[in-house]
């Protein structure tokens, strides 16, 4: 409470967080709910052009799904799902992107053990028509790789890691799937799910079922992709609201 008495303003990302500060003794006139800065992302024309070019190189006549920010215990489930999906979608390509660099070689080994053919993004090798998996073992390319995919699974959510950011996938207007463990992005996932911008899966079987439907039903796929990006757009503006709140505290700029 002593610390809160010395604070002039708190900008909370949602009402729930704001209420927590009020319960600690913050005065209501010192609280502003700005929304989450994570919504303030977009796909630039340059990025979109790069993604289109890479898609034409990698999979001009193939469907592609991406699984990102995966953790120990998830890659095995995702590779099992991919093997199952290949039975009805034999040309399907999976881009598998582990969360941490130390899991890049592990993902390669798990893919090899699963009996799937793969390439590594870091080598620059272009996937052939027989390549079933691309291991996304580079840094800083996630937004580009999302741009290649028809749908995305965001990891840390089938295992109890709290989930990772679904908005980077949503920005590309593609369907977003996550497991049940999304506490790290509780508010964002709730907003997406409420407006049909997020599909929740619980295991390999439900993942296969949902992805199969998305791959075979274009209207269903476009519906979820459109709703995901609409939720993103509807919740943008946090950065501008924050800058507006900070303006009175910043020094006046000279002419």
What kind of region is each of these model predictions?
Residues 1-255:
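Nucleotide-activated sugar donor-binding and catalytic core shared by glycosyltransferases
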């Amino acid at each position: 409470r002593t610390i809160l008495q010395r604070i002039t303003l708190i900008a909370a990302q949602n009402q729930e967080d704001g209420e927590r500060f009020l319960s600690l003794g913050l005065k209501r006139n010192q609280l502003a709910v700005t929304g989450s800065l994570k919504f303030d992302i977009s796909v630039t024309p340059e990025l979109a052009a790069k993604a289109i070019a890479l898609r034409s190189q990698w999979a001009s006549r193939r469907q592609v799904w991406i699984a990102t920010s995966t953790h120990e215990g998830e890659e095995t489930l995702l590779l099992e799902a991919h093997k199952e999906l290949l039975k009805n979608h034999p040309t399907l390509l999976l881009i598998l992107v582990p969360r941490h660099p130390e899991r890049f070689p592990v993902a390669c080994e798990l893919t090899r053990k699963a009996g799937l053919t793969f390439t590594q993004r870091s080598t620059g090798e272009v996937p052939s028509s027989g390549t079933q998996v691309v291991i996304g073992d580079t840094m800083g390319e996630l937004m580009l790789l999302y741009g290649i995919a028809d749908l995305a699974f965001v990891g840390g959510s089938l295992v109890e890691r709290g989930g990772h950011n679904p908005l980077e996938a949503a920005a590309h207007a593609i369907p977003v799937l996550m497991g049940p463990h999304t506490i790290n992005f509780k508010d964002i996932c709730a907003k997406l799910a409420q407006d049909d911008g997020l599909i929740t899966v619980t295991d390999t079987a439900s993942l296969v079922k949902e992805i199969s439907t998305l791959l075979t039903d274009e209207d269903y796929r476009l519906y979820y992709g459109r709703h995901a990006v609409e939720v993103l757009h509807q919740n943008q503006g946090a950065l501008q609201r924050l800058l507006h709140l900070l303006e009175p505290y910043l020094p006046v700029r000279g002419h």
